[in-house]
Amino acid sequence: MLNIKWIRENQELFDEKLSQRFIEPMSSKIAMLDQEKRKITSLIQEFQHARKVKSKILGNMVSKSGEEFEELQRDVNHINEKLAELEQNLDNNNELNELLNMLPNIPDEEVPYGIDGSMNKLVRAYGKTNKNALNKQHFELGTKLNLMDFEQTAKISGSRFVTLKGDLAKLERALINFMIDIHTKEFDFFEISPPFLVRDRAMYNAGQLPKFSEESFITTNGYRLIPTAEVSLVNIVADTIIQREKLPMRYVAYTTCFRSEAGSSGRDTRGMIRLHQFGKVELVSITTPEESKNEHEYITNASETILKKLDLPYRVMLLCTGDMGFAAKKTYDIEVWLPGQNQYREIASCSNCGDFQARRMKARYKEFGSNETTLVHTLNASGLPIGRTIVAILENYQNNDGSITIPDVLINYMGGLQKITTYSE
């Protein structure tokens, strides 16, 4: 959520930043609603003070009868009626909060202006891309190996699901352990095993609700399946005040993630690129405003390191204003090279959300010995999605005979296996 005080004091700049996100000016409407809310709040405070004063006088009166007592009693009753009316008006006046809840984060000054992904900015690239036209796509390789099943899985669960078998299932498990080891041992992230089912409040805190309600799965009793472990991890600090010396707090978790892929009809209908259910290692950092810029580079480097150790070609893109996620103020996308598609595809998103999520979930920190609190900054990064990493390995490590060479760093995790070959049932 955006800072209403900042909007009040920077209306022209606020509208300019909204325009970069292709949203019409909102400052005038917000200022009007804010003024109404502040007026009601001020009246409530005045009546509460008056009630306190008169109630104290009533309590100190020796005689609990007589004209003066009855007049004061009527005044207190009248104040209670007015307070109830004003508080009801305040509860009903939700338009301001509803409007603020639908507005995305303000882009950082370093974010380039742009309409869509075609206007993102190249930051750096790693590795050499293989542009052999004979390269096969991952789903061709996986099904030919008899280790990737879409057809039978569709009978079980429908479209956008997959079953991995044998050495591909083993590769999935190896990647999870490999990624967690790197993030915990080399980057000092603390491993968490969080819940996959969360309440609406947790989704709201992370910026998933109310805007993206249709993109998540909801159970019959009101829980939602997490679209990313970011939701569970950032909420670890919801409604807390953290001592400054404990920051940064860095969390890593592997979870299954669930997405309805609403609005993705016709996109990536074949293969493992866009599934309803997928595994992902997620990174979350909680830090101070002063350190969040450096932490953004740190958490991005952690994601990049996985790809470097796997020797997968990739590039880092700074997203433009029109391509950023809702809660982010600045985002790097890491795109891995897929020779079967002859193009780069997103494999990780690394975002600095500033105090946007923290304001929603009231996550603050304070210096030792001080009572003054400040909102934390939250950051997140994919570290990485397991399915898309398997896709990248299959396409970049494919051999002419259809077998897949295991990346060197994964051989021990694969029990010494150096090559995946066709499975015969």
UniProtKB/Swiss-Prot annotation:
InterPro entries: aa-tRNA-synt_IIb (IPR002314), aa-tRNA-synth_II (IPR006195), aa-tRNA-synth_II/BPL/LPL (IPR045864), Ser-tRNA-ligase_type_1 (IPR002317), Ser-tRNA-synth_1_N (IPR015866), SerRS_1_N_sf (IPR042103), SerRS_core (IPR033729), tRNA-bd_arm (IPR010978). It is found in: Cytoplasm. L-serine binds at T228, A229, E230, E282, S382. It catalyses: tRNA(Ser) + L-serine + ATP = L-seryl-tRNA(Ser) + AMP + diphosphate + H(+); tRNA(Sec) + L-serine + ATP = L-seryl-tRNA(Sec) + AMP + diphosphate + H(+). Signal peptide: none annotated. Consists of two distinct domains, a catalytic core and a N-terminal extension that is involved in tRNA binding. This is Serine--tRNA ligase. It comes from Rickettsia prowazekii (strain Madrid E). The lineage of its organism: Bacteria, Pseudomonadati, Pseudomonadota, Alphaproteobacteria, Rickettsiales. The gene is serS.
